[in-house]
Amino acid sequence: MPASPLAPARGRWLVPALIVVVSLTVGGGLLAREVYRKPDAAADTGVIATRTSQSLAPEQQPGSPVVEMTPDAAAHPHADGVRALLQNYFDAINARNYELWKTTVTKLRAQAKSKVEWEADYRSTKDGSILVYRIEAMGDGTLQSLIGFTSTQDPQDGPVDLQEPCVRWHLTLPMVLENGMWKLDAIPAGTTPMHERCT
């Protein structure tokens, strides 16, 4: 007879034990879903692992005008500010908006390029497939961003040594703080950005 009082006790522990097991299973499933969804979430924030412009058909060039970053660049403390600055810079070029462009560069650089000159330089340019590979903080408090992008333009508006309708660029852009805001500085004299014909 002593076995019968124990039976209800076992039944009482079975329900809470099942609740714990089910809760852990559901929680584990939700956690796994979040872990496996992280790449998609990263893509939504403009972080990508590889450059895709090489696979675009000629009529799709220059590709998306949205500035994207590698995971390495996106991990930099100034990534959001750099992305916003570059987005405004390329938006200004694509929209032929000189006034917006002036807000993205240093005062000295803006003064060195008149509106007439700027509009002539970018009259047929469209930029896309913009990828920030790396952001580096320099010892003097400035930043350097290693970027790649594609430009399409009338061939006569391309670089003097590569007058092509589609050019792929790789360059390092210097950025300085001016009145508390990051601005694009002039590329040092004598520096030649790497560029090649789109393939």
Segments (PLM) and residue ranges:
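Core segments of small alpha/beta cavity-forming domains
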Residues: 59-123
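Exposed beta-sheet edge and beta->alpha loop/turn motif
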Residues: 3-19, 23-43, 142-199
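Compositionally biased regions
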Residues: 5, 24, 54-56, 115
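Short solvent-exposed beta->alpha transition segments
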Residues: 98-146, 153-157
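Short structured motifs
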Residues: 86, 129-133, 170
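N-terminal low-complexity, Pro/Thr-rich disordered segments
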Residues: 31, 36-77, 192-198
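Residue-identity detector for glutamine
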Residues: 54, 60-61, 87, 111, ...
